[in-house]
């Protein structure tokens, strides 16, 4: 299982890299769970990240606006992101989600067919009226994405496991794999959750708070020693 760590700036990215993160995921918590950062920040982080490490970027907790989000995804891709993550926040059903993600996939793959597109749902979707989380693997498959992901929409201390059981998450992972997709899981993940995620076959575990001093995703800063501890648990 590989470790994705989400810095907000270059200094945090350097700490994540020093700690052994496998994917450097550029985000902006001020704009939400999958809040988008600026193109110049993606570019700057790509420049300090070793070539053998992949950079990911979120394009936001997005509304149902396929044109707008396709354009945002292209911005992330040309700024240097290898993974482009889209949070299915404002889409209400399977059909809207597939339409949105199909257009993102087309836009991104036109830039570079090796770019990786991630459809991200929310384990607590009912709290924000987002698309049902357990159909995300099917959405990802039918839209031509590469990765199906779950996160949490509201960052209030509740974790992925407060909304989905280990058994349900295992089914999510297995379904994604059956479609030939990778599976990423995140959502206020704590150290003690990592062995469980590894056991159920998760490909990528995403963290921010667990890698920050004080466990605070908003006010804490990523610390290389915390990243090292998380990385060891992923091996």
UniProtKB/Swiss-Prot annotation:
Catalytic activity, EC: 4.2.3.153
| One of the GO BP terms on file | methanofuran biosynthetic process
Keyword Lyase assigned to the entry: answer is yes
Q: What is the effect of changing residue 155 to R?
A: Almost no change in activity
UniProt KW keywords: Lyase, Schiff base
GO molecular function ontology, one term from the record: carbon-carbon lyase activity
Give the catalysed reaction(s), semicolon-separated: 2 D-glyceraldehyde 3-phosphate = 4-(hydroxymethyl)-2-furancarboxaldehyde phosphate + phosphate + 2 H2O
Among the Pfam families in the record, one is 4HFCP_synth
- Give the protein's biological function: Catalyzes the formation of 4-(hydroxymethyl)-2-furancarboxaldehyde phosphate (4-HFC-P) from two molecules of glyceraldehyde-3-P (GA-3-P).
The protein in question is named (5-formylfuran-3-yl)methyl phosphate synthase
Q: Give the gene name.
A: mfnB
